[in-house]
Amino acid sequence: MRYVIEMIVKALVDDGESVDIREVEQRGATLIEVRVAPNDVGKIIGKQGRTIRALRSLARIGGSKKNRRYLLEIVE
């Protein structure tokens, strides 16, 4: 799941080199932390949060196929 999110995020931002994705285990779920350059945060969130909602939906769907729970957060 990390690889899929990383490829999508790198395609969305201007500075693909600054993208850092980490997976952290938390209370029976896997938290995917996305770090990008400060000027790219708005591109990840999108208009009215549509882009981040879509990314979270992809993570949730991918997790359901593996019987896992994935959460996605943008970390500054």
Language-model features and meaning:
Residues M1-K43, I52-E76:
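RNA-contacting regions in translation and RNA-metabolism proteins
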